[in-house]
Structure formats: structure tokens, C-alpha cells
């Protein structure tokens, strides 16, 4: 099996290094990732300048582009063989609920799925993970991903991926299949004056999770709930954002 690994934290991030080490027993692992952090780039492709892949080690490449660029290049001519699976991560920080709209980790996985290959996005969720600087900090999460793939990935329809969030806890309680939760409105932006007297702004922090009473009543838990309670969250998500119930209502009322 040929496995392509990408991320949005950059080719030197400890999460991608831990993931590559963990998956090597499953086949050939090729890492193609941005040369520096590209968080928040979603599925963006670089169209205004050339991309320059640079091989920095055996089966490890750095690209001056976005996470989706890395996958696009890898599956459209950078290599003379095909990949069987795309794994994006392990991201330093959660990609829960509405986070998937912005996530370069998820964007890279979706790009792989557009190329007709199974794809998963993996993130490590916890308050301290942004400070982790060694691949051993991601070892438990990487092993979980190895085991998940080794057992055989469940089949998904076309244009679907698994979005996986692994809590940063001493011992995982298990795995829950979850729905994509949602957050309250983001915190307000913060404003400061820089040393040269110019006004600058920081995007506000992400909002808190919002509960869904209807889904709670049906005993389906959100990705937020699973991670907060020590479970790995596995959420099937899709590219098609059409609301078919509303579509049918509009057809009935306006058609």
C-alpha cells in the first residue's frame, strides 16, 4: 500500500513525523507537506505562482504551497506511482465542528478524496498540544491511526472523508462515531497599536461548542462531546453542502 501523508503544520512538525513512523509498517509512506505552517488554508490551491517541491529526505518533500497543493501535486504527476490512501495530520490542535470549514488538515484530505482515493484527516485535541515539539508527544495518537487503518477502513460514499479527533489524554476510553458539532459565534477580534503606531488586529478565539438537544435525545453524540469525555471522535463528512430538505421545500413553494 502506498500512503500519502500531508498536513498544514508543515513538513517539520512533530505530528506528521510521528504519523509517518507509525504507518511505515503498513506500506510505503511518502510525506509531502508545506515548507512552513499553513493552518487555516482550507482547500485553497496556489494559482498565482509556481510550486517548487524540494526533496529533503527519502520519501519526504517540502512544498512552497498549501496543504491541498501538496496533495494535488502528489497525485497529479510528482510521482510515477499511485497512492492508495491519503492521511492528513496529525494536526496540532482539534478540528471539531465548524473548524472543518477553515482547516488545512481537512482540506488536504478532501483534495485526496477528489482524486478518488480514501482519505482521513487526523487531529490531536487538547489544551497543551500547541506547545508540543517532539514526535513522542503524538505517539499514542499515531498508534491509534495505525490500528484504525490496519483493521481496514470502513467504506464511505464518494466525496466523503473521515474527520478524526483524538483527545490528548493519558488513556483513551474508546472510539465514538459522531456528528459534526457546531460552535457559538467566535470571540470578538482584539485590537492593538504596534510599535510604529499602526492599528493591528487579531482574529478572535473560536467559540464554545453548542449542544443539539434533538441529537442528544437520539443518543448520537457530537465530536465535541466525544473528545471532551476522552473518546476518539470519528466523523464522516462530505463535500456536498447542499441542504436537500430546504431544497425540496423551495422546489415545492417556488417551483
Swiss-Prot record:
Keyword Cytoplasm: yes
Gene3D superfamilies (UniProt xref): Survival protein SurE-like phosphatase/nucleotidase
GO molecular function: 3'-nucleotidase activity; 5'-nucleotidase activity; exopolyphosphatase activity; metal ion binding; nucleotide binding
Paired cysteines (S-S): none
Top-level taxon: Bacteria
Cofactor: a divalent metal cation
GO cellular component, one term: cytoplasm
Enzyme type, top EC level: hydrolase
Cofactor binding description: Binds 1 divalent metal cation per subunit.
Keyword rRNA-binding belongs to the record: no
Annotated keywords: Cytoplasm, Hydrolase, Metal-binding, Nucleotide-binding
Location in or out of the cell: Cytoplasm
EC numbers, comma separated: 3.1.3.5
Catalytic activity: a ribonucleoside 5'-phosphate + H2O = a ribonucleoside + phosphate
Pfam families assigned to the protein according to its UniProt record, in alphabetical order: SurE
Entry binding sites for a divalent metal cation: 8-9, 39, 91
Function per UniProt: Nucleotidase that shows phosphatase activity on nucleoside 5'-monophosphates.
Membership in a protein family: Belongs to the SurE nucleotidase family.
Protein name: 5'-nucleotidase SurE
Species assigned in the record: Acinetobacter baumannii (strain AYE)
Amino acid at each position: 500500500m502506498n500512503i500519502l501523508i500531508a498536513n498544514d503544520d508543515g513538513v517539520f512538525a512533530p505530528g506528521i513525523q510521528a504519523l509517518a513512523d507509525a504507518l511505515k509498517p503498513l506500506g510505503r509512506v511518502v510525506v509531502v507537506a508545506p515548507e512552513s505552517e499553513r493552518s487555516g488554508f482550507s482547500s485553497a490551491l496556489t494559482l498565482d505562482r509556481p510550486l517548487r517541491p524540494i526533496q529533503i529526505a527519502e520519501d519526504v518533500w517540502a512544498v512552497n504551497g498549501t496543504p491541498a497543493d501538496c496533495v494535488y501535486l502528489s497525485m497529479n504527476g510528482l510521482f510515477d506511482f499511485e497512492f492508495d490512501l491519503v492521511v492528513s495530520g496529525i494536526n496540532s490542535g482539534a478540528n471539531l465542528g465548524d473548524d472543518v470549514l477553515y482547516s488545512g488538515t481537512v482540506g488536504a484530505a478532501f483534495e485526496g478524496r477528489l482524486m478518488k482515493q480514501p482519505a482521513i484527516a487526523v487531529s490531536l485535541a487538547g489544551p497543551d498540544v500547541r506547545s508540543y515539539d517532539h514526535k513522542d508527544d503524538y505517539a499514542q495518537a499515531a498508534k491509534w491511526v495505525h490500528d484504525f487503518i490496519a483493521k481496514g477502513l470502513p467504506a464511505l460514499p464518494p466525496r466523503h472523508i473521515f474527520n478524526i479527533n483524538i483527545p490528548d489524554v493519558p488513556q483513551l476510553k474508546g472510539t465514538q462515531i459522531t456528528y459534526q458539532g457546531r460552535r457559538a459565534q467566535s470571540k470578538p477580534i482584539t485590537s492593538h497599536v504596534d510599535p510604529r503606531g499602526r492599528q493591528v488586529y487579531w482574529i478572535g478565539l473560536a467559540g464554545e461548542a453548542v449542544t443539539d438537544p434533538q441529537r442528544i435525545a437520539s443518543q448520537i453524540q457530537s465530536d465535541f462531546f466525544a473528545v471532551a469525555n476522552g473518546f476518539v471522535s470519528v466523523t464522516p463528512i462530505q463535500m456536498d453542502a447542499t441542504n436537500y430538505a430546504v431544497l425540496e421545500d423551495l422546489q415545492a413553494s417556488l417551483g
